[in-house]
Amino acid sequence: MGILRVYHPDIEEFVTVKNDPRELNNFNLSVAVTDAFIAACREDGPFSLVNPRNGREARKIRALSLLDLIARSAWGSGEPGLVFLDTINRSNPTPHAGAIEATNPCGEQPLLPYESCCLGSINLVKVLRGEAIDWEKLERLVHLAVRFLDTS
């Protein structure tokens, strides 16, 4: 998943890149939305885009115009999604390890910088005995699956 913060100077190009179906067609995109951006949208106010290299304001835009651009692009191409990183970080279970900066491609696993996400699944049909669940088999399978994920 490619995530760009809402205040990045290239945000408008990032938001609209998938309007061309030939661009990044096997890659998910999301915008990291901040509380400050949402507040600027509520007030229909300006919002600063900030150069990540020097921390200086590159320019101001109308927050609602950017939100409209995001919505139109999402309606047309299915992307970008929105990731509310400030909200996620308020619930960060390991803030001492760092701030969450991204998620896995589907967004269900918040990630610290440089973390990866290995997902697993279990075919529950394989633990059926007739129409009942074989709970002992499921327990063994879950333990094995967790072991595989822990060592991946």
Predicted regions and their residues:
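Active-site helix-to-loop segments that bind/position phosphate- or nucleotide-bearing substrates
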Residues: 140-147
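Active-site cavity-forming subdomains of large catalytic enzyme subunits
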Residues: 1-138, 152
